[in-house]
Regions:
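Short aromatic-glycine-(Arg/Gly/Cys) micro-motifs in beta-strand/loop hairpins
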Residues: 32-49
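Residues marking helix boundaries in flexible regions
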Residues: 7, 18, 42-45, 66
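Negatively charged, low-complexity tracts enriched in Asp/Glu with abundant Ser/Thr
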Residues: 1-26, 52, 56
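Alpha-helical context
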Residues: 9-11, 37, 41, 62
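A short, charged, amphipathic alpha-helix used as a generic interaction element across diverse proteins
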Residues: 44-46, 54-70
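Generic cytosolic/nucleocytoplasmic N-terminal low-complexity/intrinsically disordered segments
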Residues: 21, 25, 34, 48, ...
């Protein structure tokens, strides 16, 4: 997975574990990823709409964000 320009910034901590991330590409926030009910939920904006997707694996959500925000 080509995530060279991707940077994660934790912004939410639950029980000393980071459960919320802002996702940046080239210094611009492009998405968020949060853990809810044992699943990771990713959200990006596409024009005026918000696209959301979820998976049990963090890497799958990050990969989807990477593909959709190129």
């Amino acid at each position: 997975m080509g995530t060279t320009n991707i940077r994660l910034e934790g912004y939410e901590v639950t029980h000393e574990i980071v459960t919320g991330f802002k996702v940046y590409r080239n210094q611009v926030q492009v998405a968020t990823i949060e853990k809810r009910n044992n699943e990771w939920i990713g959200a990006i904006t596409a024009g005026t709409k918000v696209m959301m997707f979820q998976n049990e694996r963090f890497e799958e959500v990050l990969n989807k964000i990477n593909k959709l925000t190129v």
